[in-house]
């Protein structure tokens, strides 16, 4: 059996989901490959789409595009969207790639390849099993115009939303978002995790005592990070520590270094692969409400505060988590810091949030996705 996971270069979340699934598959001896779908056309196209996505998330542009897409999507009848039409353009190249490498199963973690696979099923008789994994806690615009075999969604309480948007109920499977189980379903003891972080980060004045506040702005570095850090520095105790992960946003990193150069309670980090250990070391996590990072946090079972979302999908994520008691969501930085301090000081309040996280998280989501695939796998297709 050979599985192709199709992602897209729009933020790190989709790729993280794909990598987590690949790790779980390889652990079980399954031949699996991840492909940036648009890179099949050209690396330049993939880069341009990634840059366009990054630009669109600034200000209110993404919110407008998302709402407009939702309006168009909800008013479609028999005609297909421009999104479908655009992804049909490279579908033949994708078909040739699938045929050349003899893949038996397709898993899409992004809408674009799901649209392309739909076109191949309709126009080129692609007849191998196909799966879609939703990496946010809501149904995205245009998903209902795709035609894959199964749609794996983050939570059972979202079934009605996806069905109401037009997805066949029998195809909806509420397993959860795949995460790296080995990293996030286990925890290092806090002192050991802090020791590792202190040893890893050079030129830092990290103190192993006190409360550690972990501020994460996503792989691209979003959110009102400057205001949050300023408020934390004003309100926390002298023995407490702030660790801020700026992702790949170098301008944010340099700006914070300039603004807070004399603040020894603050440690600034760029892009890192040590998120799991940072969560082990922290007492509270502040993060924008991306679907992947939020899922990793509740599987890790750490107090979680959702900060400024990218308008659109992340608003839905934040409200879903807040409604289920898995996080606290507010865009007011004073309130964010006040809640963070309460989570550190109020044992009952903290335990209630952690209990809600355990009740709603699936640490075995990657393996459960694989089990679903294996249960529904026919004999390999002969091209």
What spans do the regions from the language model cover?
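Active-site and donor-binding regions of nucleotide-sugar-utilizing enzymes
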Residues: 12, 17, 71-167, 171-175, ...
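Conserved N-terminal ligand/cofactor-binding loop architecture of enzyme catalytic domains
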Residues: 20-100
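C-terminal alpha-helical cap of glycosyltransferases
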Residues: 362-383
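C-terminal "capping" alpha-helix adjacent to the active site of nucleotide-linked donor transferases
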Residues: 323-325, 331-349
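Donor-nucleotide binding loops and adjacent catalytic segments primarily
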Residues: 204-281
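Acidic donor-binding loop of glycosyltransferase active sites
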Residues: 280-290
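A nucleotide-sugar donor-handling region in carbohydrate enzymes
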Residues: 149-211, 217-219, 248-249
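A short, well-ordered alpha-helix in the C-terminal region of glycosyltransferases
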Residues: 349-363
